Amino acid sequence: MVAPGVFEAVVPDFIWVTEHPIWFSGVRLRARTTVVRLSGGALWVHSPCAPTDDVCAALDALGEVRWIVVPNRFHHLQAPATAARYPNAMVVGPKSAQARNPRVSLTMSADEPEYVRATSELTPIQLGVFLSSMRLSSFTPPLAP
């Protein structure tokens, strides 16, 4: 497990992850936040973790948070606090997330033209009736030396 608040590079300079504990019905689970640097340099934050000072310092060191993505109705808990820390970021997600947590204030849904254009290197994938995610569609990671 990656230490909470520490972003581990999955693909150097492009993709990072951090894991954090969450409690669900008395069971301790791990959740993962993924950060992608888009081709224009903006950061895309998928399923945000709690925006602690350490997390925000790590994100700020990577670049400007432009997109906060609530991927489905289950991964909404830290979106309001993250949006408050990054008020210029767009919050994207399904209406079901906002219905489940009224504090989630969506800027737009993932099918709106502005979001589709800005994140064209990402392709949405449907994982089930209630779950969806994104994958890189036109990304070629640099080859290791």
Roles of regions detected by a PLM:
Residues 1-3:
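Basic, glycine/lysine-rich polyanion-binding surfaces/domains
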Residues 5-54, 135-145:
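Conserved beta-strand hairpin/beta-sheet module of binuclear metal-dependent hydrolase folds
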Residues 16, 69, 92, 123-125:
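Hydrophobic/aromatic beta-strand patches that form the interior of the parallel beta-sheet core
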Residues 25, 53, 74-78, 98-101, ...:
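Active-site environment of divalent metal-dependent phosphoester hydrolases
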Residues 50, 93, 126-129, 139-141:
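Short, structured patches in soluble enzyme cores that scaffold and shape functional sites
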Residues 50-93:
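Active-site metal-binding motif and surrounding structural segment of the metallo-beta-lactamase
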Residues 95-135:
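Metallo-beta-lactamase
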